[in-house]
């Protein structure tokens, strides 16, 4: 989150305080989520995401599902990567080791040498471009896709009710996977939505009747 605050400030020429970065860890993620996501062609990554649209900026760190063919899906182990998408550069990714004794020591020594040999005054363009016009987007205003892992009552009409609750908040279903029945009368149902407003998806989930289905987990999809 600290790195995201710095990088977003530099990239967007705006003040992006660390305190304004949304942070969510991986404690709610289970092996079941990872397995189902893999079946649907996705991998799970803990991503730091910064986006700018017009005069609004969103910054967030959370577990995210990305498609198997996304460049970031192959970044593993001690490697870190920065994936960029811009109007002129289109798609670009920078990758390298970001952990371990030697990579870390090399980066620290490089910074020390740079500070000792280069004028380290902050570039005035950055200082003066605090971009008072830019505003941070709050959680409820994000727009992304969502992976929903549900446990539903295995009876006629359950799917129709779920679709109705989602559509009532303008949330549409992109793809769905229902697993074979487990012990009891409930079955796992996996839904990936089209892009939706975060406030809308939460409002829709609040309408779910626990007698029909329960939400086991919700993961954002990029």
Ranges and model annotations:
Residues 1-74, 79-81:
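Substrate-binding/catalytic subdomain of NAD(P)-dependent oxidoreductase enzymes
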Residues 35-44, 91-99, 165-174, 217-222:
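Short secondary-structure transition/capping segments
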Residues 37, 44-46, 61, 82-84, ...:
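Generic structural hydrophobic/aromatic packing signal, biased to beta-strands
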Residues 51, 57-153, 158:
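Catalytic, metal-anchored helix/loop core of enzyme active sites in primary metabolism
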């Amino acid at each position: 989150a600290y790195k995201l605050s710095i990088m977003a400030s530099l990239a967007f020429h705006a003040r992006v305080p660390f305190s304004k970065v949304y942070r969510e860890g991986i404690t709610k993620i289970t092996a079941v989520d990872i397995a189902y996501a893999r079946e649907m062609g996705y991998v799970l990554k803990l991503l730091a995401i910064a986006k700018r649209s017009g005069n609004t900026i969103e910054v967030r760190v959370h577990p995210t599902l990305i498609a198997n063919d996304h460049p970031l899906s192959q970044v593993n182990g001690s490697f870190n990567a920065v994936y960029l998408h811009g109007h002129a550069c289109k798609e670009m990714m920078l990758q390298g080791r970001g952990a371990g004794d030697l990579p870390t020591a090399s980066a620290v020594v490089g910074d020390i040498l740079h500070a000792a040999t280069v004028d380290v005054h902050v570039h005035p363009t950055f200082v003066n471009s605090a971009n008072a016009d830019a505003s941070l987007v709050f959680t409820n205003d994000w727009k992304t896709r969502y992976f929903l892992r549900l446990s539903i009552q295995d009876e006629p009409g359950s799917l129709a009710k779920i679709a109705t609750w989602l559509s009532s908040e303008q949330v549409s279903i992109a793809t769905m996977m229902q697993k074979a029945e487990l012990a009891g009368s409930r079955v796992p149902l996996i839904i990936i939505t089209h892009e939706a407003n975060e406030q809308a998806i939460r409002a829709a989930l609040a309408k779910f009747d626990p007698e029909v289905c329960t939400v086991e987990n919700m993961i954002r999809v990029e």
